[in-house]
């Protein structure tokens, strides 16, 4: 049996081929597995469960179909879809996990994260994250009319793209540092939780890293994004493997 991990699909009506790839993945590769974990950024943006979206409806229907076959589906919010709430979770048949979460994965304690908490060198983003994860902020935002939420999301996305462009045009080494995990934070996280494996997404740099932390040999698995292809981590009792899914 196998447990599947994915993240950073960034599903968007502007990229229907990726949505179709995901729906095909749910139909053909998830049934019969032990569980499916979605570690954030399933959607490019999410401004409330009440937002009309035929694509989100199709995704919810497909996820619910998987869950009804007996495969547990878990969702951890990312930096793009942290406002996914209980109403959508019920429709999709998944359980929302806090970030981070420790699970027992075939006898090995494993820390699951979206991954943005490890990017502590990006101090501006960490401040934004702290603000937007505040329950009072979220309640106030979700109480606004849909049009106001759409406008805010568009402004936030434009600001994010502008900042990314500014960073890319600057020092390349600085860009790589700011947009990737901070090694010191990775080490501290391994020590804090006292375990030897972390699985996360967010950085779009799929890889399996072997690091030393707290005097132990540890594994950090980074999930891939779904822009030019799909990406899935398969874990069973014998090991793990990152795989690409062709469009």
Swiss-Prot record:
<feature type="binding site">
    <location>
        <position position="174"/>
    </location>
    <ligand>
        <name>substrate</name>
    </ligand>
</feature>
<keyword id="KW-1003">Cell membrane</keyword>
<keyword id="KW-0441">Lipid A biosynthesis</keyword>
<feature type="binding site">
    <location>
        <position position="202"/>
    </location>
    <ligand>
        <name>substrate</name>
    </ligand>
</feature>
<keyword id="KW-0479">Metal-binding</keyword>
<keyword id="KW-0464">Manganese</keyword>
<feature type="binding site">
    <location>
        <position position="114"/>
    </location>
    <ligand>
        <name>Mn(2+) 2</name>
    </ligand>
</feature>
<dbReference type="InterPro" id="IPR043461">
    <property type="entry name" value="LpxH-like"/>
</dbReference>
<feature type="binding site">
    <location>
        <begin position="79"/>
        <end position="80"/>
    </location>
    <ligand>
        <name>substrate</name>
    </ligand>
</feature>
<dbReference type="InterPro" id="IPR004843">
    <property type="entry name" value="Calcineurin-like_PHP_ApaH"/>
</dbReference>
<comment type="function">
    <text>Hydrolyzes the pyrophosphate bond of UDP-2,3-diacylglucosamine to yield 2,3-diacylglucosamine 1-phosphate (lipid X) and UMP by catalyzing the attack of water at the alpha-P atom. Involved in the biosynthesis of lipid A, a phosphorylated glycolipid that anchors the lipopolysaccharide to the outer membrane of the cell.</text>
</comment>
<feature type="binding site">
    <location>
        <position position="41"/>
    </location>
    <ligand>
        <name>Mn(2+) 1</name>
    </ligand>
</feature>
<feature type="binding site">
    <location>
        <position position="160"/>
    </location>
    <ligand>
        <name>substrate</name>
    </ligand>
</feature>
<dbReference type="InterPro" id="IPR029052">
    <property type="entry name" value="Metallo-depent_PP-like"/>
</dbReference>
<feature type="binding site">
    <location>
        <position position="171"/>
    </location>
    <ligand>
        <name>substrate</name>
    </ligand>
</feature>
<dbReference type="GO" id="GO:0019897">
    <property type="term" value="C:extrinsic component of plasma membrane"/>
</dbReference>
<feature type="binding site">
    <location>
        <position position="10"/>
    </location>
    <ligand>
        <name>Mn(2+) 1</name>
    </ligand>
</feature>
<feature type="binding site">
    <location>
        <position position="122"/>
    </location>
    <ligand>
        <name>substrate</name>
    </ligand>
</feature>
<dbReference type="InterPro" id="IPR010138">
    <property type="entry name" value="UDP-diacylglucosamine_Hdrlase"/>
</dbReference>
<dbReference type="GO" id="GO:0030145">
    <property type="term" value="F:manganese ion binding"/>
</dbReference>
<dbReference type="GO" id="GO:0009245">
    <property type="term" value="P:lipid A biosynthetic process"/>
</dbReference>
<comment type="pathway">
    <text>Glycolipid biosynthesis; lipid IV(A) biosynthesis; lipid IV(A) from (3R)-3-hydroxytetradecanoyl-[acyl-carrier-protein] and UDP-N-acetyl-alpha-D-glucosamine: step 4/6.</text>
</comment>
<keyword id="KW-0443">Lipid metabolism</keyword>
<keyword id="KW-0997">Cell inner membrane</keyword>
<protein>
    <recommendedName>
        <fullName>UDP-2,3-diacylglucosamine hydrolase</fullName>
        <ecNumber>3.6.1.54</ecNumber>
    </recommendedName>
</protein>
<dbReference type="GO" id="GO:0005737">
    <property type="term" value="C:cytoplasm"/>
</dbReference>
<keyword id="KW-0472">Membrane</keyword>
<feature type="binding site">
    <location>
        <position position="8"/>
    </location>
    <ligand>
        <name>Mn(2+) 1</name>
    </ligand>
</feature>
<feature type="binding site">
    <location>
        <position position="41"/>
    </location>
    <ligand>
        <name>Mn(2+) 2</name>
    </ligand>
</feature>
<feature type="binding site">
    <location>
        <position position="204"/>
    </location>
    <ligand>
        <name>Mn(2+) 1</name>
    </ligand>
</feature>
<keyword id="KW-0444">Lipid biosynthesis</keyword>
<feature type="binding site">
    <location>
        <position position="202"/>
    </location>
    <ligand>
        <name>Mn(2+) 2</name>
    </ligand>
</feature>
<keyword id="KW-0378">Hydrolase</keyword>
<comment type="similarity">
    <text>Belongs to the LpxH family.</text>
</comment>
<dbReference type="GO" id="GO:0008758">
    <property type="term" value="F:UDP-2,3-diacylglucosamine hydrolase activity"/>
</dbReference>
<dbReference type="Pfam" id="PF00149">
    <property type="entry name" value="Metallophos"/>
</dbReference>
<feature type="binding site">
    <location>
        <position position="79"/>
    </location>
    <ligand>
        <name>Mn(2+) 2</name>
    </ligand>
</feature>
